[in-house]
Amino acid sequence: MKIVSFQEMANEYELYLEASTRGYHAYFEDATVYIGEILFCELEPDNQHSKYAVVVKNEDDSIVGHVPAELSKIFNKFLSECGKKEAECIGNRFNKGRGNGLELPVDYRLVGNARYLKKLFKELQEKNTESNYNWKLSTVQKCRV
């Protein structure tokens, strides 16, 4: 994990997206997640199911799930180009019965420059509207120091 100086933080902006992490049913016996816990996202280039896979890990570096497929291509590009994304567990695990298995509700936090995040916000907003995913998006704002 990269340590960021206050000066770097002052030039960074953030965007929050409330969605979920999928696949917890495959990992919950080995990885525990608590409400309020900060989770970390990283690229998973060797994933045999998707070349855009983004894995979500807890503070113990244990896998707790993956970014949903409908977000993985966007998040993969973001991580490749900008590099910082984390998630906070905001509720108890659930299964909506749509074949996604156990999911964890999370608030994804994307950090980068304002221009890139505003473009990303627009892209996410359009995708959310077109497909009725019901994601909750914040506006792009300066990082809280």
Short names for language-model regions:
Residues 1-145:
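Conserved active-site motif detector
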